[in-house]
């Protein structure tokens, strides 16, 4: 993982939340898209179900799995590039359809795997490693989720486990 990356902290918080809620791993299906979050299904809850879908399409794959087996707890983990760029339509329609899932967006405002381009959620004026400022207004995924009628919306810093674990438990 890159220095300062929050993905491992988020995976750890998911594990702790499931443990505290006594959720048996075989009752969980974890799905991801492409990007830094793509390996998340491999990092947590051994003996659970996991699938890494194509770029931006995790919500549709999760929807299909949910229709096939409604007995599982579905957790989708996606990056800001995966959800706010190529997968923005998937993000919107999964919420609009009310898919029974926990959808975690790991948002760092940057495409880490492709050397640091700004994602659609990067703050306007933030600077890249090369000193170039982002000129675009960021997409607000939290605001969009609320407007679209998501039943539970939360935001946390990946490094604050005391805040993150209860938010994930609430989402579950």
Language-model regions, residue ranges each:
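General structural feature for long, well-ordered alpha-helical segments within catalytic domains
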Residues: 1, 6-13, 26, 87-90, ...
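Active-site diphosphate/adenylate-binding microenvironment
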Residues: 1-54
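Generic secondary-structure signature for well-ordered alpha-helical cores
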Residues: 7-10, 19-23, 67-70, 96-100, ...
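Active-site-proximal loop->helix
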Residues: 88-93, 113-125, 144
